[in-house]
Amino acid sequence: MTKEVVGDKRSFSGKDYQDPPPEPLFDATELGKWSFYRALIAEFIATLLFLYVTIMTVIGYKSQTDPALNPDQCTGVGVLGIAWAFGGMIFILVYCTAGISGGHINPAVTFGLLLARKVTLVRAVMYMVAQCLGAICGVALVKAFQSAYFTRYGGGANGLSDGYSIGTGVAAEIIGTFVLVYTVFSATDPKRSARDSHVPVLAPLPIGFAVFIVHLATIPITGTGINPARSLGAAIIYNKDKAWDHHWIFWVGPFAGAAIAAFYHQFVLRAGAIKALGSFRSQPHV
């Protein structure tokens, strides 16, 4: 999800390693490059496919476990199957798009990387737009193919489950997104990539597995958002009051979790704050 580090692995030394320079906040030259628009297309298509497969899985599970249609409710894929669908699709799509767009597929991931200066503001905003549009189109395809079941079973929209407070829902989204974005930073750390040649290849695996684990933990609470595009796409296409109740949770929670993960990785684990402070003190001041 970040630029690949190329170098001679045999001569690598922790003392010799230097972090790649941070991306500028604004870089208008990106708008004139085909690679930028190719990355936007990749994010759009990846998010579309992600929502299509996962929401179709959710709708299929609910139809299989509907007592009116299937008295034997053990025929569904269950929560485990839904979690595998979400985690598996992230693994596949990150693997396919990492070399083109970085494989974000999630506005919260993009936001975390923006705070860490891994992407420019222009790219981050355009990625989020592409992701949200892709999510809307993906859910629209599900509704087109499963129109009767889609409305009947809630359109795969996120919502706060009965018995849980708003605070619990927000906390679940913050912690779940923290786990995901923290995993993204760790799996794509350029220093680890320079030291261990297998790390870039295996990065999609822990990222997908993090999504899988978080879904197991939070599906009973919020249906698991941790991806504002996923929540927005389902809410817009389903478009019932229930889908919009507490919808803000699925934006505030993921963005807060991503911000905390970015701060923790950059300024605690990587000691970025200490380096920045040392650099500031070493500069002459007038």
Swiss-Prot record:
<dbReference type="InterPro" id="IPR023271">
    <property type="entry name" value="Aquaporin-like"/>
</dbReference>
<keyword id="KW-0813">Transport</keyword>
<feature type="transmembrane region" description="Helical; Name=5">
    <location>
        <begin position="201"/>
        <end position="221"/>
    </location>
</feature>
<feature type="transmembrane region" description="Helical; Name=1">
    <location>
        <begin position="39"/>
        <end position="59"/>
    </location>
</feature>
<feature type="topological domain" description="Extracellular">
    <location>
        <begin position="146"/>
        <end position="165"/>
    </location>
</feature>
<keyword id="KW-0488">Methylation</keyword>
<protein>
    <recommendedName>
        <fullName>Probable aquaporin PIP2-5</fullName>
    </recommendedName>
</protein>
<feature type="topological domain" description="Cytoplasmic">
    <location>
        <begin position="97"/>
        <end position="124"/>
    </location>
</feature>
<feature type="modified residue" description="N-acetylmethionine">
    <location>
        <position position="1"/>
    </location>
</feature>
<dbReference type="InterPro" id="IPR000425">
    <property type="entry name" value="MIP"/>
</dbReference>
<keyword id="KW-0472">Membrane</keyword>
<keyword id="KW-0007">Acetylation</keyword>
<keyword id="KW-1003">Cell membrane</keyword>
<dbReference type="InterPro" id="IPR034294">
    <property type="entry name" value="Aquaporin_transptr"/>
</dbReference>
<feature type="topological domain" description="Cytoplasmic">
    <location>
        <begin position="187"/>
        <end position="200"/>
    </location>
</feature>
<comment type="similarity">
    <text>Belongs to the MIP/aquaporin (TC 1.A.8) family. PIP (TC 1.A.8.11) subfamily.</text>
</comment>
<keyword id="KW-0677">Repeat</keyword>
<feature type="transmembrane region" description="Helical; Name=2">
    <location>
        <begin position="76"/>
        <end position="96"/>
    </location>
</feature>
<feature type="topological domain" description="Cytoplasmic">
    <location>
        <begin position="1"/>
        <end position="38"/>
    </location>
</feature>
<feature type="compositionally biased region" description="Basic and acidic residues">
    <location>
        <begin position="1"/>
        <end position="18"/>
    </location>
</feature>
<feature type="modified residue" description="N6,N6-dimethyllysine">
    <location>
        <position position="3"/>
    </location>
</feature>
<dbReference type="GO" id="GO:0006833">
    <property type="term" value="P:water transport"/>
</dbReference>
<dbReference type="Pfam" id="PF00230">
    <property type="entry name" value="MIP"/>
</dbReference>
<feature type="short sequence motif" description="NPA 1">
    <location>
        <begin position="106"/>
        <end position="108"/>
    </location>
</feature>
<dbReference type="GO" id="GO:0015250">
    <property type="term" value="F:water channel activity"/>
</dbReference>
<feature type="topological domain" description="Cytoplasmic">
    <location>
        <begin position="270"/>
        <end position="286"/>
    </location>
</feature>
<feature type="topological domain" description="Extracellular">
    <location>
        <begin position="60"/>
        <end position="75"/>
    </location>
</feature>
<feature type="modified residue" description="Phosphoserine">
    <location>
        <position position="279"/>
    </location>
</feature>
<keyword id="KW-1133">Transmembrane helix</keyword>
<feature type="transmembrane region" description="Helical; Name=3">
    <location>
        <begin position="125"/>
        <end position="145"/>
    </location>
</feature>
<comment type="function">
    <text>Aquaporins facilitate the transport of water and small neutral solutes across cell membranes.</text>
</comment>
<keyword id="KW-0812">Transmembrane</keyword>
<dbReference type="InterPro" id="IPR022357">
    <property type="entry name" value="MIP_CS"/>
</dbReference>
<feature type="short sequence motif" description="NPA 2">
    <location>
        <begin position="227"/>
        <end position="229"/>
    </location>
</feature>
<feature type="region of interest" description="Disordered">
    <location>
        <begin position="1"/>
        <end position="23"/>
    </location>
</feature>
<feature type="transmembrane region" description="Helical; Name=6">
    <location>
        <begin position="249"/>
        <end position="269"/>
    </location>
</feature>
<dbReference type="GO" id="GO:0005886">
    <property type="term" value="C:plasma membrane"/>
</dbReference>
<feature type="topological domain" description="Extracellular">
    <location>
        <begin position="222"/>
        <end position="248"/>
    </location>
</feature>
<feature type="transmembrane region" description="Helical; Name=4">
    <location>
        <begin position="166"/>
        <end position="186"/>
    </location>
</feature>
<keyword id="KW-0597">Phosphoprotein</keyword>
<feature type="modified residue" description="Phosphoserine">
    <location>
        <position position="282"/>
    </location>
</feature>
